[in-house]
């Protein structure tokens, strides 16, 4: 079985783990239709930047 030659320091462990964070999605209020949506994404009703971009979106 493989055994590490040296103890991994706290700094090395933490540097390696910096990429394992959970990212909170950016949510903004869309005043055009009164819904919340993710930034730079189409709303659930099919609007983006105040214009209808998806024809068959729900409601």
Swiss-Prot record:
Record carries keyword Ribosomal protein: yes
Gene Ontology biological process terms, A to Z: translation
Keyword Cell division: no
Signal sequence range: none
Keywords: Ribonucleoprotein, Ribosomal protein
GO molecular function: structural constituent of ribosome
Cellular component GO terms held in the UniProt record: large ribosomal subunit
Cross-referenced HAMAP family: Ribosomal_bL32
Family: Belongs to the bacterial ribosomal protein bL32 family.
Name of protein: Large ribosomal subunit protein bL32B
């Amino acid at each position: 079985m493989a055994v590490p030659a040296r103890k991994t320091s706290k700094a090395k462990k933490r540097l390696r783990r910096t990429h394992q964070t959970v990212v909170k999605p950016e949510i903004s209020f869309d005043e055009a239709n009164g819904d919340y949506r993710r930034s730079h994404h189409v709303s659930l009703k099919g609007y983006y930047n105040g214009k209808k971009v998806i024809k068959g979106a729900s409601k």
